[in-house]
Amino acid sequence: MPSFDIVSEIDMHEVRNAVENAQRELTSRWDFRNVNASFELNEKSESIKIASESDFQVNQLVDIMREKLAKRGIDGAALNIPDDMLHSGKTYSVDATLKQGIDTPTAKKIVKLIKDSKLKVQAQIQGEQVRVTGKARDDLQSVMALVRGAELGQPFQFTNFRD
């Protein structure tokens, strides 16, 4: 029976490249001259600290970071940015976390979405991924389109496609 896995993974090497590119752009932009602004990647906690002297500049830096991630093939929805900014001294900062892996509530939403579609496939949660099996390859491709079109707040990849 054909099957595939729905996963949510981020290549940390590409994230590191995107952070370095964003830092490089930051040094060359005239509106950030003589401004204490930075991007810091923490690979262990999978987060990016974005800091600057004003909240408006932090929002600009977030846009730069999303643009650089998109150029490196990482969906901007993978970057989770909190609404509140940390303010200490004369610096505003934000700790943006990278969403990786499918948590249980999201996996349950995916399974429910697939079951509600009435396609002849089975979906089962396996840790941080969802395995979908079915008799027809066309049904599996319909499930892929369904999951891509669903707004679940996280980018998904489809791996391990077997016939």
UniProtKB/Swiss-Prot annotation:
It comes from the Bacteria. Keywords: Nucleotide-binding. It holds the Pfam family DUF520. Disulfide bonds: none annotated. One of its GO terms (cellular component) is cytosol. InterPro entries: DUF520 (IPR007551), UPF0234-like_C (IPR035571), UPF0234_N (IPR035570), YajQ-like_sf (IPR036183). GO terms for molecular function: nucleotide binding. PANTHER family: UPF0234 PROTEIN YAJQ. Belongs to the YajQ family. Nucleotide-binding protein. NCBIfam families: PRK05412.1. This is Nucleotide-binding protein plu3881. The lineage of its organism: Bacteria, Pseudomonadati, Pseudomonadota, Gammaproteobacteria, Enterobacterales.
